[in-house]
Amino acid sequence: MVMTDPIADLLTRIRNANKARHPKVDMPSSKLKLEILKVMKQEGFIKDFSVNKDKFPKITVTLKYSDTNERVIKGLKRISKPGLRVYASIDNLPRVLNGLGVALVSTSKGILTDREARQQQIGGEVLAYVW
């Protein structure tokens, strides 16, 4: 089966596992997913991730919860979709919950947060919001 939107699949798997309070979630691997997960780990939304390099590579994401088993990820939303791409210039880069959340932006310098994109003065495709 061909996956038409791997980013939406990644976000949905994380959202569902997070709501069910699963400690880990597995998904098929891709370079784009690894870049997104790297940014999510830097921002503190996930604990860790690892790649299982079998015949069909899989990513195992370890989700992050507080000491009282409270979810760190409150929400995930896909913005730019295959049917409707959403691009933003430097001036129009979105702020998620007045800076409490993060917009994932695909730029010529890789996947960056909205803050990093503003610092580097580059716009790009707004992939998703994480808060």
UniProtKB/Swiss-Prot annotation:
Complexes and interactors: Part of the 30S ribosomal subunit. Contacts proteins S5 and S12.
A single GO molecular function term of this UniProt record: structural constituent of ribosome
One GO CC annotation: ribonucleoprotein complex
Official protein name in the record: Small ribosomal subunit protein uS8
Family label: Belongs to the universal ribosomal protein uS8 family.
InterPro entries: Ribosomal_uS8, Ribosomal_uS8_CS, Ribosomal_uS8_sf
Keywords for this protein: Ribonucleoprotein, Ribosomal protein, RNA-binding, rRNA-binding
Phylogenetic lineage: Bacteria, Bacillati, Mycoplasmatota, Mollicutes, Acholeplasmatales
Pfam family, one: Ribosomal_S8
Organism: Acholeplasma laidlawii (strain PG-8A)
Function in brief: One of the primary rRNA binding proteins, it binds directly to 16S rRNA central domain where it helps coordinate assembly of the platform of the 30S subunit.
Protein origin, superkingdom: Bacteria
GO annotation terms (biological process): translation
NCBIfam families reported in the protein's UniProt record: PRK00136.1
